[in-house]
Amino acid sequence: MNTQDVIDIFKQADAILEGHFILTSGRHSATYMQKAKVFMHAHLTEKLCRGLAEKIKKSVEEKIDYVVGPAIGGLIPSYETSRHLGIPSLWVERVNGRFELRRFEIKKGARVVIVEDIVTTGLSIRETVEALVTAGANVLASACILDRSGGKVDVGVPLISLAEYEIASYASDAVPAELAELPAIKPGSRNI
Protein backbone atom coordinates (compact mmCIF):
# COMPACT_ATOMS: atom_id res chain seq x y z
CA MET A 1 0.00 0.00 0.00
CA ASN A 2 1.38 3.41 -0.95
CA THR A 3 0.49 7.01 -0.14
CA GLN A 4 -1.94 7.32 -3.05
CA ASP A 5 -3.77 4.16 -1.90
CA VAL A 6 -4.20 5.73 1.56
CA ILE A 7 -5.42 9.04 0.10
CA ASP A 8 -7.84 7.14 -2.15
CA ILE A 9 -9.31 5.38 0.91
CA PHE A 10 -9.80 8.75 2.63
CA LYS A 11 -11.47 10.08 -0.54
CA GLN A 12 -13.69 7.00 -0.78
CA ALA A 13 -14.93 7.76 2.76
CA ASP A 14 -15.37 11.50 2.01
CA ALA A 15 -12.84 12.07 4.78
CA ILE A 16 -10.75 14.89 3.27
CA LEU A 17 -12.38 18.10 4.44
CA GLU A 18 -11.62 21.64 3.27
CA GLY A 19 -12.13 24.77 5.38
CA HIS A 20 -10.41 26.26 8.45
CA PHE A 21 -9.56 23.68 11.09
CA ILE A 22 -7.81 23.81 14.42
CA LEU A 23 -5.98 20.49 14.63
CA THR A 24 -5.54 18.43 17.79
CA SER A 25 -2.00 19.83 17.90
CA GLY A 26 -3.40 23.37 18.10
CA ARG A 27 -2.10 24.23 14.63
CA HIS A 28 -4.43 25.58 11.92
CA SER A 29 -4.95 23.99 8.50
CA ALA A 30 -7.14 24.36 5.42
CA THR A 31 -7.33 20.55 5.14
CA TYR A 32 -8.58 18.08 7.74
CA MET A 33 -8.22 14.34 7.37
CA GLN A 34 -11.36 13.13 9.20
CA LYS A 35 -10.26 9.62 10.08
CA ALA A 36 -13.53 8.96 11.95
CA LYS A 37 -15.23 8.85 8.53
CA VAL A 38 -12.76 6.15 7.50
CA PHE A 39 -12.90 4.22 10.78
CA MET A 40 -16.70 3.91 10.59
CA HIS A 41 -16.12 1.53 7.65
CA ALA A 42 -14.55 -1.70 8.92
CA HIS A 43 -13.41 -2.81 5.46
CA LEU A 44 -11.49 0.44 4.87
CA THR A 45 -9.97 0.40 8.35
CA GLU A 46 -8.95 -3.22 7.86
CA LYS A 47 -7.13 -2.36 4.61
CA LEU A 48 -5.20 0.51 6.19
CA CYS A 49 -4.24 -1.41 9.32
CA ARG A 50 -3.25 -4.54 7.39
CA GLY A 51 -0.93 -2.33 5.34
CA LEU A 52 0.46 -0.73 8.49
CA ALA A 53 1.00 -4.13 10.12
CA GLU A 54 2.95 -5.27 7.04
CA LYS A 55 5.19 -2.18 7.26
CA ILE A 56 5.77 -2.78 10.97
CA LYS A 57 6.74 -6.43 10.29
CA LYS A 58 9.28 -5.27 7.69
CA SER A 59 10.69 -2.48 9.89
CA VAL A 60 10.85 -3.96 13.40
CA GLU A 61 13.18 -6.94 13.71
CA GLU A 62 12.60 -7.64 17.41
CA LYS A 63 9.65 -9.58 18.77
CA ILE A 64 6.83 -7.20 19.72
CA ASP A 65 4.89 -7.93 22.92
CA TYR A 66 2.20 -5.25 22.63
CA VAL A 67 0.77 -2.63 20.33
CA VAL A 68 -0.19 0.49 22.30
CA GLY A 69 -2.46 3.28 21.11
CA PRO A 70 -3.04 6.70 22.62
CA ALA A 71 -6.73 7.29 23.38
CA ILE A 72 -8.84 8.45 21.64
CA GLY A 73 -7.45 8.63 18.12
CA GLY A 74 -5.12 5.65 18.35
CA LEU A 75 -7.63 3.16 19.79
CA ILE A 76 -9.12 1.83 16.57
CA PRO A 77 -5.94 1.67 14.45
CA SER A 78 -3.87 0.16 17.27
CA TYR A 79 -6.49 -2.52 17.90
CA GLU A 80 -6.91 -3.42 14.24
CA THR A 81 -3.15 -3.35 13.59
CA SER A 82 -2.53 -5.62 16.59
CA ARG A 83 -5.10 -8.05 15.17
CA HIS A 84 -3.05 -8.31 11.97
CA LEU A 85 0.16 -8.72 13.98
CA GLY A 86 -1.43 -11.37 16.21
CA ILE A 87 -0.44 -9.65 19.47
CA PRO A 88 -2.36 -7.90 22.28
CA SER A 89 -3.42 -4.27 22.05
CA LEU A 90 -3.30 -1.89 25.01
CA TRP A 91 -3.90 1.83 25.31
CA VAL A 92 -2.85 4.84 27.29
CA GLU A 93 -5.36 7.46 28.33
CA ARG A 94 -5.20 10.91 29.84
CA VAL A 95 -5.38 11.23 33.60
CA ASN A 96 -5.12 14.84 34.79
CA GLY A 97 -3.83 15.83 31.35
CA ARG A 98 -1.06 13.19 31.11
CA PHE A 99 -1.08 9.81 29.39
CA GLU A 100 -1.00 6.77 31.68
CA LEU A 101 -1.20 3.04 31.14
CA ARG A 102 -3.91 2.82 33.78
CA ARG A 103 -5.99 -0.24 32.87
CA PHE A 104 -3.07 -2.58 32.24
CA GLU A 105 0.17 -3.78 33.76
CA ILE A 106 3.14 -4.75 31.64
CA LYS A 107 6.33 -6.55 32.56
CA LYS A 108 9.45 -4.43 32.84
CA GLY A 109 11.18 -4.44 29.47
CA ALA A 110 8.05 -5.37 27.48
CA ARG A 111 8.68 -4.57 23.82
CA VAL A 112 6.01 -2.28 22.41
CA VAL A 113 5.14 -0.45 19.23
CA ILE A 114 2.89 2.60 19.45
CA VAL A 115 0.22 2.92 16.76
CA GLU A 116 -1.44 6.28 16.12
CA ASP A 117 -3.91 7.44 13.51
CA ILE A 118 -2.52 10.71 12.11
CA VAL A 119 0.67 12.51 13.13
CA THR A 120 1.17 16.26 12.72
CA THR A 121 3.55 17.41 15.48
CA GLY A 122 4.08 14.02 17.13
CA LEU A 123 3.09 15.24 20.59
CA SER A 124 0.71 12.36 21.35
CA ILE A 125 3.37 9.81 20.42
CA ARG A 126 6.05 11.58 22.49
CA GLU A 127 3.67 11.65 25.47
CA THR A 128 2.84 7.97 24.92
CA VAL A 129 6.55 7.09 24.82
CA GLU A 130 7.00 8.91 28.14
CA ALA A 131 4.08 7.05 29.75
CA LEU A 132 5.30 3.68 28.50
CA VAL A 133 8.90 4.22 29.59
CA THR A 134 7.58 5.26 33.02
CA ALA A 135 5.62 1.97 33.09
CA GLY A 136 8.83 0.05 32.30
CA ALA A 137 8.30 -0.66 28.60
CA ASN A 138 10.90 -0.76 25.86
CA VAL A 139 9.42 1.30 23.00
CA LEU A 140 10.79 -0.19 19.78
CA ALA A 141 9.04 2.15 17.34
CA SER A 142 5.90 4.08 16.60
CA ALA A 143 3.66 3.83 13.57
CA CYS A 144 0.87 5.85 12.02
CA ILE A 145 -1.53 5.62 9.14
CA LEU A 146 -0.77 9.14 7.93
CA ASP A 147 2.17 11.44 8.67
CA ARG A 148 0.95 14.97 7.85
CA SER A 149 4.47 16.35 8.34
CA GLY A 150 5.79 14.57 5.27
CA GLY A 151 8.42 12.72 7.31
CA LYS A 152 9.74 15.81 9.12
CA VAL A 153 8.39 15.15 12.62
CA ASP A 154 10.63 13.72 15.37
CA VAL A 155 8.75 11.57 17.88
CA GLY A 156 11.82 10.35 19.78
CA VAL A 157 11.62 6.77 18.44
CA PRO A 158 11.55 5.48 14.86
CA LEU A 159 8.29 6.43 13.08
CA ILE A 160 6.84 4.00 10.55
CA SER A 161 4.25 5.69 8.35
CA LEU A 162 1.84 3.96 6.02
CA ALA A 163 1.70 7.26 4.13
CA GLU A 164 3.59 10.54 4.28
CA TYR A 165 1.41 13.35 3.02
CA GLU A 166 2.56 16.85 3.83
CA ILE A 167 -0.35 19.17 4.49
CA ALA A 168 0.37 22.79 5.37
CA SER A 169 -0.42 23.77 8.95
CA TYR A 170 0.20 27.02 10.78
CA ALA A 171 0.82 28.26 14.30
CA SER A 172 -2.13 30.31 15.59
CA ASP A 173 -0.14 33.54 15.16
CA ALA A 174 0.85 32.72 11.56
CA VAL A 175 -2.46 31.80 9.92
CA PRO A 176 -2.67 33.18 6.35
CA ALA A 177 -5.26 35.96 5.93
CA GLU A 178 -7.43 33.95 3.52
CA LEU A 179 -7.64 31.09 6.03
CA ALA A 180 -8.24 33.43 8.99
CA GLU A 181 -11.31 34.82 7.18
CA LEU A 182 -13.05 31.43 7.49
CA PRO A 183 -14.67 30.35 10.77
CA ALA A 184 -12.41 27.86 12.56
CA ILE A 185 -13.68 24.37 13.42
CA LYS A 186 -11.95 22.18 16.06
CA PRO A 187 -12.84 18.57 15.24
CA GLY A 188 -9.97 16.86 17.15
CA SER A 189 -10.09 14.77 20.33
CA ARG A 190 -7.58 16.40 22.68
CA ASN A 191 -9.14 17.62 25.94
CA ILE A 192 -12.27 15.51 25.52
Swiss-Prot record:
Pfam families: Pribosyltran
Gene behind the chain: pyrE
Cited SUPFAM superfamilies: PRTase-like
Cofactor: Mg(2+)
NCBIfam families: pyrE_Therm (TIGR01367)
Catalysed reactions, as listed in the record: orotidine 5'-phosphate + diphosphate = orotate + 5-phospho-alpha-D-ribose 1-diphosphate
Coiled coil: none
PANTHER family recorded: OROTATE PHOSPHORIBOSYLTRANSFERASE (PTHR19278), URIDINE 5'-MONOPHOSPHATE SYNTHASE (PTHR19278:SF9)
Recorded superkingdom: Bacteria
A molecular function (GO) term: magnesium ion binding
Name recorded for this polypeptide: Orotate phosphoribosyltransferase
Positions that bind 5-phospho-alpha-D-ribose 1-diphosphate: E116, D117, I118, V119, T120, T121, G122, L123, S124
Keyword Magnesium: yes
Entry EC no(s): 2.4.2.10
Top-level EC class: transferase
Similarity field: Belongs to the purine/pyrimidine phosphoribosyltransferase family. PyrE subfamily.
Subunit structure: Homodimer.
Metabolic or biological pathway: Pyrimidine metabolism; UMP biosynthesis via de novo pathway; UMP from orotate: step 1/2
Role of this protein: Catalyzes the transfer of a ribosyl phosphate group from 5-phosphoribose 1-diphosphate to orotate, leading to the formation of orotidine monophosphate (OMP).
Any one GO biological process: 'de novo' UMP biosynthetic process
